Amino acid sequence: MKLTGEVALITGGASGLGRALVDRFVAEGARVAVLDKSAERLRELEVAHGGNAVGVVGDVRSLQDQKRAAERCLAAFGKIDTLIPNAGIWDYSTALADLPEDKIDAAFDDIFHVNVKGYIHAVKACLPALVSSRGSVVFTISNAGFYPNGGGPLYTATKHAVVGLVRQMAFELAPHVRVNGVAPGGMNTDLRGPSSLGLSEQSISSVPLADMLKSVLPIGRMPALEEYTGAYVFFATRGDSLPATGALLNYDGGMGVRGFLTAAGGADLPEKLNINREGQE
């Protein structure tokens, strides 16, 4: 186990990628505190992991709630080694032309308050503990932090902002705290949208992402949630990732290396090399 004795705090950790991260970190020997708005899902998480996980019901937009989560983690486990600001909302690729003029301000605030301010609050709340433990921060970014069409202008702007946060925080917190970012691609989660656009009850799981990404990604399929968690484990380890701070990992199935005519240039390699891979796909 790679994280034996370590303690992590994860925001938005009761569902989706966050829950997969909790499961993986506990499996690697860590103890985990989770800040999430769903009391029911937090109870399920605590039952599943016993004394290795504690939940705090709260709003990532509130610095006081973030401080309560940090205090609960310290009370339960004595330290914070890794912080993963992960909670977010999506704009469902609402284009600028489709944003009603009377809702732009509210939608901007909704998305930026969760996706950017929530991350800043998390670091602020945990900073003394992270400096004390010489720990690390691993921000969840998105492919939208690097490429267009991963969302609309509001979501894309928030994720580009997180890229800037990684770099600035890596500078400000050095040499005491390492700060890195993981930019996953599409995944099947319960990610919701802003209430200002009437999207708070819509889930990204209703979008047929797996079918859409199959022909788009060079790896040929949409990764499962648990397949995204390894990068976070890597950045959280103290030995293997010691030189890494300010690092941005595109972990999206190869979006940046797609070809113009086809996503994967080597799709016919087994045929060319007379390799029989029947039953291995």
UniProtKB/Swiss-Prot annotation:
Active site per UniProt: 155
CDD domains: BphB-like_SDR_c
Residue runs in coiled coils: none
InterPro entries recorded: BphB-like_SDR, BphB_TodD, NAD(P)-bd_dom_sf, Sc_DH/Rdtase_CS, SDR_fam
GO molecular-function terms, A-Z: cis-2,3-dihydrobiphenyl-2,3-diol dehydrogenase activity
Pathway(s): Xenobiotic degradation; biphenyl degradation; 2-hydroxy-2,4-pentadienoate and benzoate from biphenyl: step 2/4
Biological process (GO), any one: catabolic process
Domain of life: Bacteria
Catalysed conversion reaction: (2R,3S)-3-phenylcyclohexa-3,5-diene-1,2-diol + NAD(+) = biphenyl-2,3-diol + NADH + H(+)
EC number: 1.3.1.56
Keywords for this protein: Aromatic hydrocarbons catabolism, NAD, Oxidoreductase
Binding sites annotated in the UniProt record for NAD(+): 10-34
Transmembrane segments: none
Binding-site residues, substrate: 142
Subunit structure, as described in the record: Homotetramer.
Family that this chain belongs to: Belongs to the short-chain dehydrogenases/reductases (SDR) family.
Name of the protein described by the UniProt record: Cis-2,3-dihydrobiphenyl-2,3-diol dehydrogenase
Organism: Comamonas testosteroni
Encoding gene (name): bphB
